[in-house]
Amino acid sequence: MNRARKLLHPAKARDVIKALSRLGLAARHTKGSHVFMKHPDGRTTTVPVHPREEIDRRLLRKIASDIGIHPEEFMYIIDQT
């Protein structure tokens, strides 16, 4: 198992949205069960919000890529919420 897999773990959508807000992204709109978030500099990402499910590592890595942050750093911010 590589180091990134050890550090990345599933997270609740609520915690991911809080972490993105701490990074300066704001919820622009919601469509169905997805929240579209945008940073003032133009970076965007979409977060699925399903109350009984967690966001898996692959999607967390994709969200981190969308906003231009290292996945491990993003996980650290999520864990601080």
Question: How would you label these PLM feature ranges?
Answer:
Residues 1-29:
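N-terminal first-folded block
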Residues 6, 50, 64:
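Short, flexible active-site loop motifs that bind/organize anionic cofactors or intermediates
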Residues 55-81:
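C-terminal structural segments of small proteins and small subunits
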